[in-house]
Amino acid sequence: MSDRKPVRGRHQARKRAVALLFEAEVRGISAAEVVDTRAALAEAKPDIARLHPYTAAVARGVSEHAAHIDDLITAHLRGWTLDRLPAVDRAILRVSVWELLHAADVPEPVVVDEAVQLAKELSTDDSPGFVNGVLGQVMLVTPQLRAAAQAVRGGA
């Protein structure tokens, strides 16, 4: 068994999810395929750490809901198109919008703060403010989207 452990903490898990989404886009495959490849590699080579479960959940979730997530981001871009954004910003926004819609255990302000921090660490000087603005607009509609999804699932 390997002495290497998966990355601890959600910040690092989110950062890794952003990297996986970036890799998937560059390779022209889904993030879920990247997760599957990484899981198989970690299984075959014990010295390679497994992905953090949250990283895998986010990447798979973004893959599963990609069209809806991209539509929601696009609807809140002003003066930009999704394909014109830096690839890292796209990945950060996709992870964050997935969390806003599907990670009920993560408070919305935490999602936005984490996204801004990732933009500071990984992207351009203008990206943190841009990411904050887009997510601020998306947050205005997420309660209605979550309620509609719950109603479709037949929940209360």
Curated annotation (Swiss-Prot):
GO terms for biological process: DNA-templated transcription termination; transcription antitermination. GO terms for molecular function: RNA binding. Keywords: RNA-binding, Transcription, Transcription antitermination, Transcription regulation. Pfam families: NusB. GO terms for cellular component: cytosol. Was identified as a high-confidence drug target. Belongs to the NusB family. Homodimer. PANTHER family: ANTITERMINATION NUSB DOMAIN-CONTAINING PROTEIN, N UTILIZATION SUBSTANCE PROTEIN B-RELATED. Involved in transcription antitermination. Required for transcription of ribosomal RNA (rRNA) genes. Binds specifically to the boxA antiterminator sequence of the ribosomal RNA (rrn) operons. This is Transcription antitermination protein NusB. It comes from Mycobacterium tuberculosis (strain ATCC 25618 / H37Rv). The gene is nusB.
